[in-house]
Amino acid sequence: MEDSEPERKRARADEATAGGSRSEDEDEDDEDYVPYVPLRQRRQLLLQKLLQRRRKGATEEEQQDSGSEPRGDEDDIPLGPQSNVSLLDQHQHLKEKAEARKESAKEKQLKEEEKILESVAEGRALMSVKEMAKGITYDDPIKTSWTPPRYVLSMSEERHERVRKKYHILVEGDGIPPPIKSFKEMKFPAAILRGLKKKGILHPTPIQIQGIPTILSGRDMIGIAFTGSGKTLVFTLPVIMFCLEQEKRLPFSKREGPYGLIICPSRELARQTHGILEYYCRLLQEDSSPLLRCALCIGGMSVKEQMETIRHGVHMMVATPGRLMDLLQKKMVSLDICRYLALDEADRMIDMGFEGDIRTIFSYFKGQRQTLLFSATMPKKIQNFAKSALVKPVTINVGRAGAASLDVIQEVEYVKEEAKMVYLLECLQKTPPPVLIFAEKKADVDAIHEYLLLKGVEAVAIHGGKDQEERTKAIEAFREGKKDVLVATDVASKGLDFPAIQHVINYDMPEEIENYVHRIGRTGRSGNTGIATTFINKACDESVLMDLKALLLEAKQKVPPVLQVLHCGDESMLDIGGERGCAFCGGLGHRITDCPKLEAMQTKQVSNIGRKDYLAHSSMDF
């Protein structure tokens, strides 16, 4: 018994030691233990890691594209004092980094704008369907018999550049003809020189100094100059000379012609241009030159009268797109021998929906023609598109395209909607008559006209809703001084010339800044000074007011307090890529990315989806 007791104690001791060693092993196992993670959870974790890696890679690529180094730990400089780096150096380093980021933002903006311009650019060239279908292209401009005087040709290119710099003439193109500073040196006949003198035109304006020699040389041209700078003479005098040359070589027979064609966007402008051509043709005839016939083809007039001139053979024709297309389709007019085409206020015609009509008119030409485009406002988008119709064109720009005339004093006043009519009478007292009043809506024109008549003011009104006879009588009465005030919509703002006007009143702000430039350009013409008063209020679109503010600053005019408070964010972003403002509409207060005109056009296009009639023009519906 005594022997078994120690054995039992030993066994307990062994169990105790064994238990102790087991607990130590268990502790070690606890330390090495990895908890079990379900398969789904493991997959989610792996996916998260992959996404993080991909994001990191993408941000590095973006930073490389923008030209900045990938941000690492060394970029995260703690703000505050650092060892071996002065606060000035630290400030300079941070400033450089901020400028680098700003530059990348500008580059990004430019890329975005290029994409937008490409998307809105017209895919088809401004050519006839026949020319595009047959792949007809012309490499060389039309040859003419005119050459500059020998001594002008012998002058150096440096001298020509000095003349252009003196008159602020910007030219683009190859083989540009030299600028000529007098009408006599341009080889015009004595009768035309006398006619110019009678009108008080003694020296050519900057656009005429470079433009007339360019056209007489037979070159295609885009002419951009501020309102009242004499653009009409640039394309009317050369066409008279070309037609006179053709008539002397071989007289025009019955139903032949025209040789020269001028297209205008409005009837009033066409009538005015026709009057200028008639004046110089009459002077040439009095000076024993052959009779040159000029036809006026506009809507609202009897076709019979127009055909009477055409039947005898016509040298020149001034027309509006609608009536000209009608006569061409009815085969009453032929453009077989036409070699000279001028589009006055070209950007408005292309922009205002006449583009299809212009293409159709182009398809009636049988050979190469000399094409000229003129306007006071021509955004980059229109210039690029128009160049597709020209052969080695010369672009002549006097001042910025769309800039206001510096001879006009611009006054902008905040007037409540209900107070406009009463304040209008006060504004009429600023200058002696004649005065021109513009309004956007036809109803406003009629209301202003009626109010002025009730107050005893001698006023006339024109807008698209009135018939042609009434419009013509109103303009003639105003031009002759029988009436003191002309109230009109924008139909009278394009190209019309009323020499004595000292004051233009904008009853409302137009929806596009281009129309504002054309409106105020009716005064301050031919070197005279004029005043333009514009009423603005809360109803005006802010983007147009921003453009107006920029236009006033550019012309060094007084900016009213109501416009001074307007800000468009980062002003430096308005002037990037070597061009200020919007490339689509020409406004200075915004870029193409924020253009309200482009936005309105895109909205209209979207709303027209599904409504378009896909039947061809004049086709039968079977």
Curated annotation (Swiss-Prot):
Segments of skewed composition (Acidic residues): 24-33
Chain spans, region Disordered: 1-39, 51-84
Positions carrying N6-acetyllysine: K9
Cellular component annotations (GO), alphabetically ordered: catalytic step 2 spliceosome; cytosol; endoplasmic reticulum; nucleus
Chain ranges for the short sequence motif Q motif as given in the UniProt record: 181-209
Cross-link named Glycyl lysine isopeptide (Lys-Gly) (interchain with G-Cter in SUMO2), sites: K416, K442
Database matches in SUPFAM superfamilies: P-loop containing nucleoside triphosphate hydrolases (SSF52540)
Posttranslational modification: Acetylation at Lys-9 regulates the nuclear/cytoplasmic localization.
Subcellular location: Nucleus; Cytoplasm
Keyword Ubl conjugation: yes
Keyword Transmembrane helix: no
Record's protein name: Probable ATP-dependent RNA helicase DDX41
Species of origin: Mus musculus
Gene that specifies this protein: Ddx41
